[in-house]
């Protein structure tokens, strides 16, 4: 373990670092580095996202690289990176003489327990930061739980990466990572993936980066989850709505968006609100067995091309009724705004894309159906045109569309 980069000049009278004195030393958040999923079969998960969502396998770690207990595939599209990790041995069935480290044994047990509890799910959301040690120590001083102390991972050919891990809501963690001294395929221990053997050319999917990552909480847990980001990571409240704004005939929710100081990382936090029936947030919490990541929003420069390509590849999106577009057409004719819609509205309707706007700009968005048999995680595709909101004008339509899916599952 590498020593802390915090200078002793910041120590208080007890000899422990006084992190409150060094806020200027704490790093900028440069965005999302990657999202790690713990899944039952990493190879198949990577193949699914490559085929259906237009990713490509970038890096691999497994038996061939000396990883005896886990296999990981890194897939990416532009600056979006997902890591799928699976255990490849049973922790309970290991022989007594198995030469496994205590750390690997513990991780193997945790991974199997996570899969039993949550199914295939997001385990970690990694942030790229300038100063891993500064962010980590400030977070821990403010009460964050430590998963991994700051550590340097080294690869003789490609350099080194500095990482640390803290715990957030549920069983989810945040890796803090700095790649300033690394030029390898992903992390030390990974190798560049072999080229795809596919012979059929599918339509390309233009993506840019992760726009935001949404966490669902159980009843009355949203405020405490937001407090973690405010106190431990110095995030601020960027945007919020309550059940008076996000509601249907049957259900409602509250939502607060927490953002890093430079707004490059945004973490919306949801919780259920009282309603006549079970909300999508409650359904998620039941089938995820607690709080966790509900969806990941992927920013695209061209949502028409992205959604068209994804539909051609087999992505299942939610269905939006035609009455939604009747209302949109009427609003666009009558409401004052300082922009013109660049995309063809008939094409937007054909693809079931949602639109929200204010006087200054607009966004286009669409949500997939849940990606697993458990109705938990899904993907959002979003395009922003001078608009930094989160589609509040679409929440009622979105909720109603999701409720129709819930009703089919018998969960409304």
From Swiss-Prot:
EC annotation from Swiss-Prot or TrEMBL: 1.13.11.27
Pfam families in alphabetical order: Glyoxalase
GO molecular function, one term: metal ion binding
Pathway: Amino-acid degradation; L-phenylalanine degradation; acetoacetate and fumarate from L-phenylalanine: step 3/6
Domain of life: Eukaryota
Catalysis performed (reactions): 3-(4-hydroxyphenyl)pyruvate + O2 = homogentisate + CO2
Binding site for Fe cation: 212, 295, 380
Note on cofactor: Binds 1 Fe cation per subunit.
Domain VOC: from-to ranges: 31-179, 209-369
PROSITE patterns per record: VOC (PS51819)
Cofactor(s) for this UniProt protein: Fe cation
Enzyme class: oxidoreductase
InterPro entries registered for this protein in UniProt: 4OHPhenylPyrv_dOase (IPR005956), 4OHPhenylPyrv_dOase_C (IPR041735), 4OHPhenylPyrv_dOase_N (IPR041736), Glyas_Bleomycin-R_OHBP_Dase (IPR029068), Glyas_Fos-R_dOase_dom (IPR004360), VOC (IPR037523)
GO biological process: L-phenylalanine catabolic process; tyrosine catabolic process
Keyword field: Dioxygenase, Iron, Metal-binding, Oxidoreductase, Phenylalanine catabolism, Repeat, Tyrosine catabolism
Family, per entry: Belongs to the 4HPPD family.
UniProt protein name: 4-hydroxyphenylpyruvate dioxygenase
Organism encoding this protein: Neurospora crassa (strain ATCC 24698 / 74-OR23-1A / CBS 708.71 / DSM 1257 / FGSC 987)
Taxonomic lineage from the root: Eukaryota, Fungi, Dikarya, Ascomycota, Pezizomycotina
